[in-house]
């Protein structure tokens, strides 16, 4: 049998060599030392040989981490990042594994409606999407403003239903005549410090 010209390895063990050794007589081969000295462990990913199994195990752990990073990069690439983002996962998949998840970059969902309740003086705001507008005096739907669209973008979404509410007029951009504060384009803050009213 010609074992020197062909070899078949599985997990670093030459299979053809072991079968030919079993077929040969029990005569020792010349120049062979103990079995542990001549045994080499081969990486199944890059075919690099190692002297012991511990070194091979550590090396294969590095391959495992590389595969995890590539798998994460592929998952991110299949989900698709927004087009306005300056990051291209196809150019370097290892770097794309450290990118923020796409759902953090997508357009935010609108927050629930905030209802102004006329019945309770201690807690004026109620949160809920299923409250009907006939039970509330006014409602405020903040949409994109709470997520970085700017407070001025909320001013156009304020609607009042029946009655004159100074709290709602402040959000809509009207001036509060009692305090003299002019709120322009939606929400404004009086940042002047004073000791009294």
Curated annotation (Swiss-Prot):
GO cellular component: cytosolic ribosome; nucleus
Gene Ontology biological process terms in this record: abscisic acid-activated signaling pathway; cytokinin-activated signaling pathway; gibberellic acid mediated signaling pathway; negative regulation of abscisic acid-activated signaling pathway; regulation of DNA-templated transcription; trichome differentiation; trichome morphogenesis
Tissue-level expression: Highly expressed in roots, mature stem and lateral branches. Expressed at low levels in rosette leaves and siliques.
Localization in the cell: Nucleus
Induction: By cytokinin and gibberellin.
PROSITE patterns hit by this protein: ZINC_FINGER_C2H2_1, ZINC_FINGER_C2H2_2
KO phenotype (gene knockout): Reduced number of trichomes on sepals, cauline leaves, lateral branches and main inflorescence stems.
GO MF annotations, alphabetized: DNA-binding transcription factor activity; transcription cis-regulatory region binding; zinc ion binding
First and last residues of each zinc finger (C2H2-type): 41-63
UniProt keyword annotations, A-Z: Abscisic acid signaling pathway, Cytokinin signaling pathway, Developmental protein, Differentiation, Gibberellin signaling pathway, Metal-binding, Nucleus, Transcription, Transcription regulation, Zinc, Zinc-finger
Function: Probable transcription factor required for the initiation of inflorescence trichomes in response to gibberellin and cytokinin. Acts upstream of GIS, GIS2, ZFP8, ZFP5 and the trichome initiation regulators GL1 and GL3. Acts as a negative regulator of abscisic acid (ABA) signaling during germination and early seedling development.
Name of this protein: Zinc finger protein 6
Organism: Arabidopsis thaliana (Mouse-ear cress)
């Amino acid at each position: 049998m010609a074992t020197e010209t062909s070899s078949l390895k599985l997990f670093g063990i030459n299979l053809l060599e072991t079968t030919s050794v079993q077929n040969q007589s029990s005569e020792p081969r010349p120049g062979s030392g103990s079995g542990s000295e001549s045994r080499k462990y081969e990486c199944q990913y890059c075919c690099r040989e190692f002297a012991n199994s511990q070194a091979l195990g550590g090396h294969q752990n590095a391959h495992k981490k590389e595969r995890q990073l590539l798998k994460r990069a592929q998952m991110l690439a299949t989900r698709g990042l927004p087009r306005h983002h300056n990051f291209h996962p196809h150019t370097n998949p290892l770097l794309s594994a450290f990118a923020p998840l796409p759902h953090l970059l997508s357009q935010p969902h609108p927050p629930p409606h905030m209802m102004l309740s006329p019945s309770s003086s201690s807690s004026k705001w109620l949160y809920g999407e299923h409250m009907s507008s006939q039970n509330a005096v006014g409602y405020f739907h903040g949409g994109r403003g709470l997520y970085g669209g700017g407070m001025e973008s909320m001013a156009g979404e304020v609607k009042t239903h029946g009655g004159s509410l100074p709290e709602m007029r402040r959000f809509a951009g009207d001036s509060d005549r009692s305090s003299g504060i002019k709120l322009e384009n939606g929400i404004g803050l009086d940042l002047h410090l004073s000791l009294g009213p």
